[in-house]
UniProtKB/Swiss-Prot annotation:
InterPro entries: Neuropept_BW_pre, Neuropept_W_pre. It holds the Pfam family NPBW. Residues 1-32 form the signal peptide. This is Neuropeptide W.
Length: 152
């Protein structure tokens, strides 16, 4: 009896082994060539790459950081037995002395504000006086149906 060669199962194993080696040689899926591999997907190599590299937080977070920090809310700082104090505790529509650092209005505007505030409580409508420039100006021309047609 002579030596036999490899059987039909051996050639199938060799083919399977060769196929597995070829699969190992294939490259892994890669990202696009113009994107950084070690950064989030919105950091590109394009014209905004330098600007985007510093934005690692969400836009909502850095917008919130840009706003000035608000103090505690008025209703959070007072107990039930403690009356509120300070300018934020006053009602904005209630009359009272203005703070010393409040800007003063010109006398004409001040009287108009006081009259308007008084008429708001009584329900009387108040209109502002016309400006002196409007009194001396010519009346505006009336627009009729003929003004919309062409003068042919």
């Amino acid at each position: 009896m002579g030596a036999r060669g490899p059987g039909p199962g051996a050639t199938a194993r060799r083919r399977l082994l060769a196929l597995l080696l070829l699969l190992l040689l294939l490259p892994l899926p890669a990202r696009a060539w113009y994107k950084h591999t070690a950064s989030p997907r919105y950091h590109t190599v394009g014209r905004a790459a330098g600007l985007l590299m510093g934005l690692r937080r969400s836009p909502y977070m850095w917008r919130r950081a840009l706003r000035p920090a608000a103090g505690p809310l008025a209703w959070d700082t007072f107990g039930q037995d403690v009356p509120p104090r300070g300018p934020s505790a006053r009602n904005a529509l209630s009359p009272g002395p203005a703070p010393r650092d409040a800007p003063l209005l010109p006398p004409g505007v001040q009287t108009l504000w006081q009259v308007r505030r008084g008429s708001f409580r009584s329900g009387i409508p108040v209109s502002a006086p016309r400006s002196p420039r409007a009194r001396g100006s010519e009346p505006q021309p009336e627009l009729g149906a003929s003004s919309w047609t062409s003068a042919e």
